[in-house]
């Protein structure tokens, strides 16, 4: 099987982002057709795998903040979700919110979350996540 994998990888190439193949169809990875026009896409299992992998990465990023371990599960979920949605570089721009979280001032952290471009862009998601940060409860 490893020889087969090696051969297919060599023939197809490996591309870590979506691209158009030689016939103009959206493809990713090792020749994986994702173009909807031809029935391409991902299975539910593949979607779940990708999500779990992304959450694992965001969890590891969240654990780099000294204050993260002291948060309860709903507040940790808010931070992980923000990292998932924004990416770490953009989440690191939430300095006032992060400082408030570190100080245990969750009301201010929630206010700072809502006072952002992100909140204007995502609407109800921001309201829900700010409420979770404020209360420490699942919503």
Residue positions per predicted region:
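Long, amphipathic alpha-helical surface segments
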Residues: 1-17, 23, 32-37, 42-55, ...
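Active-site nucleophile-His-acid catalytic modules used for acyl/amide transfer and hydrolysis
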Residues: 57-83, 87-91
């Amino acid at each position: 099987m490893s020889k087969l994998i090696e051969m297919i990888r060599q023939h197809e190439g490996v591309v870590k982002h979506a691209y158009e193949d030689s016939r103009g169809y959206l493809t990713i990875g090792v020749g994986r057709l994702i173009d909807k026009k031809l029935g391409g896409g991902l299975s539910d299992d593949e979607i779940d795998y990708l999500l779990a992998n992304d959450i694992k990465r965001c969890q590891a990023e969240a654990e780099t903040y000294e204050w993260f371990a002291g948060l309860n599960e709903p507040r940790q979920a808010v931070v992980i979700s923000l990292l998932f949605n924004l990416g770490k570089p953009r989440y690191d721009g939430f300095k006032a919110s992060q400082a408030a979280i570190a100080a245990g001032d969750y009301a201010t952290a929630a206010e700072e979350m809502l006072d952002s471009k992100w909140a204007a862009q995502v609407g109800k998601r921001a309201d829900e996540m700010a409420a979770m940060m404020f209360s420490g409860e699942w919503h």
